[in-house]
């Protein structure tokens, strides 16, 4: 049980499915009686699905391309990135690559122990507020 730590939990996330969307419910610790504590609410009897993390860079590139398209030139993004994602990046050796990409996108922020999105507490995500110049009149 000693080897079950944050790095193992980050590499093997669990998620709850709500309306065709999956929301990660990160394990915080395993207790001596083998019960689990999570970083956010998990109701008794809820069905959790084992997830497989994918590469973060293509996902972040797609996210920022979409933001540019919708908002125009990004001036600053205030980012909240779950610390479990950081552990994942450290373990797979891509921390510098992702850090460089986020710097190029003018992201400033910090690592968190959970994020709020659409009124829901979630884990192992990147959330933020993007500030842009805006699009020319007539663009959506």
Residue map of PLM features:
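Small-residue-enriched flexible segments
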Residues: 1-105, 112-140
């Amino acid at each position: 049980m000693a080897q079950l730590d944050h790095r193992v939990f980050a590499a093997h996330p669990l998620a709850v499915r709500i309306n065709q969307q999956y929301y990660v419910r990160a394990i915080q610790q395993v207790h001596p009686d083998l019960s689990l504590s999570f970083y956010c609410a998990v109701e008794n009897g809820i069905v959790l699905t084992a997830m497989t993390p994918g590469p973060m860079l293509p996902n972040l590139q797609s996210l920022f391309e979409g933001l540019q398209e919708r908002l125009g030139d990004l001036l600053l993004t205030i980012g909240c990135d779950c610390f479990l994602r950081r552990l994942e990046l450290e373990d797979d050796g891509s921390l510098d690559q992702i850090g460089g990409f986020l710097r190029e996108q003018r992201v400033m922020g910090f690592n968190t122990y959970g994020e709020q999105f659409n009124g829901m507490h979630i884990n192992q995500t990147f959330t933020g507020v993007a500030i842009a110049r805006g699009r020319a009149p007539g663009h959506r």
